[in-house]
Amino acid sequence: VTDPAEGFVHLDDREVHSGRIWSVVVGQFTSPGGVITRDIVRSPGSVGVLPVLFDPEGVPSVVLVEQYRPALDRAVIEIPAGMRDVPGEDPAATAARELTEEVGMVASRLEHLTTFSPSPGMTDATTMVFLALDCTNTQRAAQGPEEEAMITHHLPLADALGLVESGAIHDAKTVIALLM
């Protein structure tokens, strides 16, 4: 088996846009067929956190949010999440912060479930997914108009999995978190 990356060398990036969080670069690479360029979105990455609660009988439920997503121009049901936009902040601390901001919860235990690349054909972004356990309620600290307008859903895990199966939940980080 040959290495599909063999013969590719990243030569240079030229920034063509710098936004509040992301930048867009034109990357130049050598390839087995010659020099190529690719548009790449550079991102600090993100976190998602799945709060799991248990009733007295041990039946699990999850806490999801529904918020407007401007890129899709509609509301999306998803796990609490956010960008890793605080330089030097530990990803688990980012997950804990997002849990408080979006659903007003504090987790006694945060466990890293997985890290994935949501769209490796266009961005270097990675998303780290955490499981939040032993959660208690605290004051919600919404940041921005989307979070202020978001709705919180407490659902039995089985119902959330049904929403994945039906396609009502289609956000990648949420599907991954619920199926893990």
Question: What would you call each of these model-derived segments?
Answer:
Residues 12-50:
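Acidic, metal-coordinating catalytic segment for phosphate/diphosphate chemistry
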Residues 15-20, 70, 116-127:
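Acidic pyrophosphate-coordinating catalytic loop
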Residues 23-34, 119-139:
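Active-site-adjacent beta-strand/loop module that shapes the phosphate/pyrophosphate-binding cleft
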Residues 29, 51, 64, 131-132, ...:
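Conserved hydrophobic "DFG−1" position in protein kinase catalytic cores
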Residues 63-64, 78, 98-100, 111-112, ...:
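Conserved beta-strand segments that form the floor/walls of ligand-binding pockets within enzyme
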Residues 86-114:
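Internal catalytic-core helix/loop-beta-alpha segment
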